[in-house]
From Swiss-Prot:
Keyword Metal-binding part of the UniProt annotation: no
Biological process, per Gene Ontology: adipose tissue development; fat cell differentiation; negative regulation of translation; regulation of translation; Wnt signaling pathway
Gene3D superfamilies linked: Leucine-rich Repeat Variant
Originating gene: Ifrd2
Protein name from the UniProt record: Interferon-related developmental regulator 2
Length: 441
């Protein structure tokens, strides 16, 4: 549900933390095909014709009009929903996966509103009685349902009914780490979208904080002692916690800063590159929130923190994968630049004829959270989902006819010239960065 940029309480209307967005007409985005669809598993079950279909099959060819596509997709979705209560665990898992792929690619609020109670009951049984992968898929579907239903009464009711189960699985040390990971993500996203009570927000923050805080012990080596099997869980819990910080009242932010800012740097020594990056981004977000509360905010252990960030920004250890080293250096250079100077690098996301500008760590965390759950469907939802457009300040959904779209589309030659110029500028910028990388030391 939309929240104010600087607000100290959850409320209806307005805009979320992260500032307003700018949108402009641009060339075709060239969005990639849904990578997640290639991972859809075919499952032997009582309804093989339903579960073997990918999302692209549901969407139909160009010869079929939009109405027929919608009806065809809804018929298949009805079959998926029916299979959620099947006796076979494989059938239920296949139905959950197919449902997840379909809902990430299309917007179907009316269809889901009519079946919200049925879906809630089915997901509750999957979370209660399912094991491992089934629980993980159920939590993933719940996250997408919250995005589809939005902050309205049905979305709030769905999240409230399943929130205790998500917390139960997340807090169960004997549960599958994969299931706990997806429950953490669903808890954070569901609370961000559908929770209306500050107490719900505080309880979710406390639960997520409890998951990763134990790895920030009193000793500096605590993070390195975490089993590799739990790295994904800690990363998901930390990211979900950071997402909820973007809508947390200022009075609570002050206590969280005092409690967590001295402890989070310990996670920078983790063996997991994803956990190190999640910790670095969370630290940058905490600094951003602290400076929002107090413009001349000063962190006591600034020198040691910047030293750790600088080490990761220039890391060249050969035992780490080359791709991981490159990604880590890029992100930690941005984190160090912000912590030291307070300037956040701006990112642009092009979708359709519009552009989304990400100019703060809060907006970065919010966008990444939705992108993680929607995959390449994020572009479709940015164009058509009123919830996301409200969150990022994109305004009403653009309605353009075929003639308008054709008029806006540039020629292949013009696109080639634009890409060539962009490539040249990017090469020059990277060359300068490589030449001066030693200056960080």
């Amino acid at each position: 549900m939309p929240r104010a940029r600087k607000g100290n309480a959850l409320r209806k209307g307005g805009q979320r933390r992260g500032g307003g967005a700018r949108s402009s007409t641009q060339a075709d985005s060239g969005s990639s095909e849904d990578e997640a669809a290639s991972e859809a598993r075919s499952t032997t079950s009582d309804c093989p014709s339903l579960l073997s279909a990918t999302t692209e099959d549901c969407l139909g060819g160009e010869a079929v009009d939009e109405q027929s596509q919608q009806e065809n997709l809804e018929e298949k979705l009805k079959g998926y929903v029916d299979c959620l209560t099947d006796k076979s665990a494989k059938t239920r898992q296949g139905a959950l996966e197919s449902l997840r792929l379909a809902l990430a690619s299309r917007l179907l609020p009316d269809f889901l509103l009519e079946r919200s109670l049925t879906l809630a009951d089915a997901l509750e049984k999957c979370l209660k009685k399912g094991k491992g992968e089934e629980q993980a898929l159920a939590a993933a579907v719940l996250g997408i349902l919250c995005v589809q239903l939005g902050p309205g009464p049905k979305g709030e009711e769905l999240f409230r009914s399943l929130q205790p189960l998500l917390i139960s699985v997340l807090s169960d040390s004997t549960a599958s780490p994969t299931a706990r990971l997806h429950c953490a993500s669903a808890l954070g996203l569901g609370c961000y979208v559908a929770a209306t009570d500050v107490q719900d927000l505080v309880s979710c923050l406390a639960c997520l904080e409890g998951v990763f805080s134990w790895s920030c012990g009193t000793s500096g080596s605590a993070a390195s002692l975490v089993p590799a099997s739990l790295h994904g869980l800690l990363c998901a819990a930390l990211q979900a916690w950071a997402l909820l910080l973007t809508i947390c009242p200022g009075t609570h932010i002050s206590h969280i800063l005092d409690r967590q800012l001295p402890r989070l740097p310990q996670l920078l020594s983790s063996e997991s590159v994803n956990l190190r990056i999640a910790a670095g981004e969370a630290i940058a977000l905490l600094f951003e929130l602290a400076r929002d509360l107090e413009e001349d905010f000063v962190y006591e252990d600034m020198e040691a923190l910047c030293g750790s960030l600088r080490t990761l920004a220039t890391d060249s250890n050969k035992y780490r994968a080359k791709v991981d080293r490159r990604r880590q250096r890029s992100i930690f250079r941005a984190v160090l630049h912000f912590v030291e100077g307070g300037e956040c690098e701006e990112e642009t996301v092009r979708f359709g004829l519009e552009v989304l500008y990400i100019d703060s760590w809060a907006r970065h965390r919010i966008y990444t959270a939705f992108k993680d759950v929607l995959g390449s469907g994020i572009h479709y939802h940015l164009q058509n989902n009123e919830l996301l457009r409200d969150i990022f300040g994109l305004g009403p959904v653009l309605v353009l006819d075929a003639a308008a779209l054709k008029a806006c589309k540039i020629s292949r030659f013009e696109k080639h010239l634009y890409n060539a110029a962009a490539f040249k500028a990017r090469t020059k910028a990277r060359s300068r960065a490589r030449d001066k990388r030693a200056d960080i030391l």
